[in-house]
Curated annotation (Swiss-Prot):
A molecular function GO annotation: metal ion binding
Similarity remark: Belongs to the small Tim family.
Gene Ontology, cellular component aspect: mitochondrial inner membrane
Species classification: Eukaryota, Metazoa, Ecdysozoa, Nematoda, Chromadorea
Protein name: Mitochondrial import inner membrane translocase subunit Tim9
Motif (Twin CX3C motif): 24-48
Gene giving rise to this polypeptide: tin-9.1
TM stretches of this protein: none
Organism of provenance: Caenorhabditis briggsae
Length: 78
C-alpha cells in the first residue's frame, strides 16, 4: 500500500516536473542557432522556475491554512 502511494507520488512529481520544464522551455528558448544556452534564455528559465516554486509554496501554504480553519470549524461545531 505504502509502496503504491510512493510510486504514485513519484509519478505525480515527474508529471509536474515535465510540465514545468516544457512550459519554461517553450517560453524561454526561442533561438536554435546555437548549441549553448544564452544568458537571456538562462535568466528566463531561472525566473520561470523560481516563479513556479514560489507559486507552489504559496498554494501549499494557503491549503494548509484552509485545512486548519476547517478543522477548527468542525471542532467548534461538535
Amino acid at each position: 500500500m505504502a509502496s503504491e502511494q510512493n510510486i504514485q507520488t513519484f509519478r505525480d512529481f515527474l508529471t509536474q516536473y515535465n510540465l514545468v520544464a516544457e512550459q519554461c522551455f517553450t517560453s524561454c528558448v526561442n533561438e536554435f542557432g546555437s548549441r549553448t544556452v544564452n544568458a537571456k534564455e538562462e535568466s528566463c528559465a531561472n525566473n520561470c522556475l523560481d516563479k513556479f516554486l514560489k507559486m507552489t509554496q504559496r498554494v501549499s501554504q494557503r491549503f494548509q491554512e484552509h485545512q486548519i480553519l476547517n478543522a477548527q470549524a468542525n471542532g467548534a461545531a461538535m
